Amino acid sequence: MFRLSIALIFLTTFILHSQQKEPPALDPSFHKERRQMVLEQLPPNSISVIFSAPIRNRANDVDHPYHQNPNFYYLTGFLEAHAALVLLGTPMNVEGSPVQEILFVRDQDPYYALWEGDIKGPKATQKEYAIDKVLSTTKFKSFLSSLQGINNINHFPFFDDVRDHPRNENDLFSLLTAFKGFISAQSELSKPEDNSLTIDQEYLPDVVGSLREIKTAKEIEILKQAVAMSAIGQVEVMKAIHPNMSERELQGIHEFIFKKYGAKHVGYPSIVGAGAHGCVLHYTANTADQVGNQLVLMDVGAEFQNYTADVTRTIPANGKFTKEQAEIYNLVLAAQNAGIEASVVGASFSDPHRVARSIIQQGLIDLGIIESEKEVRTYFPHGTSHYIGLDVHDPGTYGPLRANS
């Protein structure tokens, strides 16, 4: 099994090394096509608003590295904070031209540039991102006030951790405050008996989630790159692991490989669990100073060009499975292979899980670990699969499997 893995990773390593430079990220035409697909599904006289992600605080005056809202990135490609995308179901004249899409971004700020780096500003953003109209966030509130005849308002559920930045009057907090005020004003103007206004925070997530489920060829290429570098990390750990190593050291090898091959971030906190730690589904502490002569579960994924892999492997720290460990390992491997075989277009999303669960269930009975089918949940309390993409648990319909989902 290890020889096969190493052979496959040698091939992916060659592929990654053979590229002279990082392949280009998704170009503006991709995001424009996504916006058009959303616009085609919006009712007339509607407004849909999608906000950038908030800046999240780590402690005191130190923030976490910024990570864009995946839905906002999917529709714009824009990676800066404090921004809002407006999509209109009916074209509206804005500054002399009829438009259906408007992106509001911050103006350039020399003070901010000194401390944090340049921001693009409306003019450069308009040129780079192929959006009908790009305006300063200073105009967002007045734009909303100018809207007439709106009878449908769509948005994603609001973030609950948006901080007010007192020195920035046009931050995300201000944008959200203005939009919430707009909703309240429209609600007061509408007549309840006429049902003349619809405010919906489910329609837009459903529309965008269904689109995100189906990947383009370029998205699949990026995901393959993310998976390849994540798999290389697994093999590098297989070569380096020793019982005296800590979980943190193994995590460091994985994340070094991610950076080496071009990933800027992890797709989610790396899980490296030795022994009982490997039984904690979302164990991210990685605090064991020695992994010992135990099995080590490693659930890790590189985030490459905003798309994340999710690769899990379990290996013996001393390089050799015991008889009991091998029995469980091979049982899980058989379930995985059966789940892969069941993952075909037209099958129910739950089919791979049912097949894998059945094999685990019977295997545990055969090994004498459980006596009845209902006990399998003790050892298999979760689903078998999920979509991956801009999120490690990517949205989708979770209905019949579709091509390129």
Q: What kind of region is each of these model predictions?
A:
Residues 8-10, 377:
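Residue-level detector of alpha-helix boundary/anchor positions
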Residues 19-405:
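Active-site neighborhoods and metal-handling regions in enzymes and metal-associated proteins
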